[in-house]
Amino acid sequence: MATASPAADGGRGRPWEGGLVSWPPAPPLTLPWTWMGPSWGQHPGHWGFPALTEPSASPAAGLGIFEVRRVLDASGCSMLAPLQTGAARFSSYLLSRARKVLGSHLFSPCGVPEFCSISTRKLAAHGFGASMAAMVSFPPQRYHYFLVLDFEATCDKPQIHPQEIIEFPILKLNGRTMEIESTFHMYVQPVVHPQLTPFCTELTGIIQAMVDGQPSLQQVLERVDEWMAKEGLLDPNVKSIFVTCGDWDLKVMLPGQCQYLGLPVADYFKQWINLKKAYSFAMGCWPKNGLLDMNKGLSLQHIGRPHSGIDDCKNIANIMKTLAYRGFIFKQTSKPF
């Protein structure tokens, strides 16, 4: 655990020249402060801001990274302090502007999300531009992109066999911003049980007209591959992984139907993150009711219709963004085939 004095830089406030110091320089204190969460991925409570830039500043002068960390003062009181880190110098003009704008919110007893929200609004309102308005950042993830997937399949009570995929949605989620960058969404014509049951329509909201005349699974898989290539996801230098709500989609449904139809399963479908497991690691409890429990546990509103594949993907993406915002690092949960 590292310690730093608010006056460690002689009150000049230049963190690029000597470790981490408070920004702006705090009044001199005789007792040191203890910084909690020295690096991302090791300690929760480490929050960051992406590079801040201004159109009027040169790249060399306008780059910088801000972090928000919870600290304890000598009396044991907890507070938040933003820091500037990184090798690049931050324009003194921009730094002074940001200091004036944030003012009393620099040391605030509020929680990290509230602090970030206040800071974002104040900085954006004073003309810091789009990058500043979206300055809340996330811990570095292991993947450049997350591919959120949630199948809907033919079903009935009692269950029919084999089940067939009838909705095939994928959201391309940027691993740095946790924002959706692209969407793949197709309905699939079932061939073994071409007529949807009333139970299936009631559960998924998919009616017969939505699947009649649609491409077969083989054709949809070919289009998925084309979409993956177009999005740069097949580049060996780009790390991506699928994310599902459970193991059923990629451990049972897709390989089972492909085996039945004699179709190969692409390698990129053979590793994934089970969001239920990720959530349980992050929150310490298992979401028995899947997305409903995860949304409730994170105080999120459910998006769209339950058991709509594309809406379920949006909920998964929203849950991932919230967990990432809290500092969670997503890791592969599936075992190699």
UniProtKB/Swiss-Prot annotation:
Hydrolase found in the keyword field: yes
GO molecular function, one term: 3'-5'-RNA exonuclease activity
UniProt entry keywords in alphabetical sequence: Exonuclease, Hydrolase, Magnesium, Metal-binding, Nuclease
Ranges for domain Exonuclease: 146-320
Highest taxon of source: Eukaryota
Residues that, per the record, bind Mg(2+) 1: 150, 152, 312
Binding-site list for AMP: 152, 307
Name of this chain's protein: ERI1 exoribonuclease 3
